[in-house]
Each structure stands twice: as C-alpha cells, then as structure tokens.
Regions:
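Charged, solvent-exposed interaction patches on well-folded alpha/beta domains
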Residues: 1-252
Length: 252
C-alpha cells in the first residue's frame, strides 16, 4: 500500500493505483498516514478499486437520468396534442348560412358565441401548455441535479487521485519523506481538497493548500527552510502558509 487513511471514520490502506482494503487488526504496515476531516469518494466499508466504485455510481446516476427522461415522453405527447388543439382553434371560422336565409342578427349571435367558446378554449389550452411545460422543466431540473452529482463525484475522485500522487511525491523525495511526519486533509466549504503538513522540525504546521503546483510549492518551502528559518528561528511561528503565489506567510 501507498498510504493509510484515517479520515472521517476511515481506517483503510490504499495502493498507488487506487485499490482500497481494510486495515488489518492484528498488524500495521508502516506507510504514510493521512488524517483529517477529508471524506474520500467511497464508503468506509468499501474494498476494491476506487475507479470501479466511481464508474458504478456514475452508471447508477445515468440510469436515473434516463428514467427521468422517460417520464417526459407522455408529457411530450400531451404537449403535441395541445399544440394541435391550438392550431385547430385558430382555424375555427363562422360562415353565413345562406341556405337557411340566416339574418344578420342570427349570424352575429353565432359569431359572439364562437368568440366566447374560442376565448374559453384558448385559456384552457394556454393553462394546459404552461402546466405541461412546468412539469417538463421540473423533471429537467432533477436531471440537472443528477448531472451535478456526477460532476461532483468525478471531481471528488480527481482530488482523491491527486492526494495519492501527492503522498507518492513526498515518499519519493528523501528530504520530505523524512521531514513530513503527518498529512492532514480536509475539504473546504467550496468543495476543494486542501492539506496541512506536520513537519519533524519546529513546532509549526505547514498550510500547503490545494494539491496544485506541488513541485513549485515544495521548492518555495525548501528555500524558506534553507534561507529563512535558520535566521528567524524554528519555533517562532505557529503556521507557515505556502498557499499563495511567491509568498510564504507566517503567523505566530
């Protein structure tokens, strides 16, 4: 295994290619440990490939989207029927019945009656069209919510794999493998994954932030280790923040 997860109720080992298995009770494997409130994109009891779990969940969501699409079919048929009724309503006309020697008064009465009938039908069809359209849009909204779930799931998986890559990069560097004692991962309110590092040297916590531009951040931190901390003092600050471009922000 590459790492042990002790986050948000998890206690599992993960390999570099994303295979999860439960931590054995009788023994421990000496690998880096990730703690914190971070919630991986799989349940605590899961054993297996994380990618397979994600694909299964995405497939379930696809089925739900397709199921919702089928709910639209009768609404589309009702909408087409309503459109035909509206077209037929526009074609309704009154012709004078010359063969019955219809007078102007009788004709005008029939015209008024037809106008009232058309007005009532127009209101009915417009109301029906609005109700049908609102129901279609409601279902479309549910589909969009499912698609957002898919995007969130993919982003969660992407962050998880970034975390594994990050741990691997620490392990592959002799200096940082010795210096980083603990990695704490958490999810920000915006949904981004950020990490904090507990180093062997000093009494501070390193706010690493998002797992982006990892090499640049480690390079910046290493320069600060060599040029800044020896003169400032290793126990002067409580946090060292390297989340910002070309800056190292220290707080007591």
């Amino acid at each position: 295994p590459l790492v042990r997860l002790l986050t948000d109720g998890m206690n599992a080992y993960v390999t570099a290619d994303g295979y999860v298995f439960a931590a054995p009770r009788a023994s421990s494997l000496y690998v880096p440990v990730v703690t914190g409130s971070y919630r991986p994109p799989f349940p605590a009891s899961y054993v297996g490939s994380v990618r397979e779990h994600i694909d299964l969940r995405l497939g379930e969501i696809d089925e739900r989207i397709a199921e919702l699409e089928r709910e639209k079919y009768p609404l589309y048929r009702r909408e087409m029927e309503n459109d035909r009724n509206i077209s037929a309503l526009r074609r309704m006309r009154i012709k004078r019945q010359w063969w019955r020697l219809e007078g102007s008064r009788e004709f005008d009465e029939r015209v008024d009656a037809l106008r009232e009938k058309k007005a009532a039908l127009r209101r009915t069809y417009r109301y029906r069209a609005r109700v049908i359209r609102e129901e279609i849009e409601r279902i479309a909204g549910l589909q969009e919510a499912e698609r957002r779930k898919q995007k969130k799931l993919e982003k969660s998986y992407e962050d998880f794999m970034k975390l594994l890559t990050f741990v691997e990069s620490v392990e592959n560097d002799d200096f940082w493998r010795s210096e980083v004692v603990q990695i704490a991962a958490h999810t920000t309110p915006s949904g981004a994954l950020e990490v904090e590092l507990t180093p062997r040297s000093g009494r501070f916590t390193i706010l690493f932030g998002r797992l982006e531009e990892v090499e640049r951040k480690f390079g910046k931190l290493e320069r600060f280790y060599r040029r800044g901390l020896p003169s400032i003092g290793w126990n002067e600050y409580r946090t060292i923040d390297i989340r910002y471009n070309d800056q190292v922000v220290c707080k007591k």
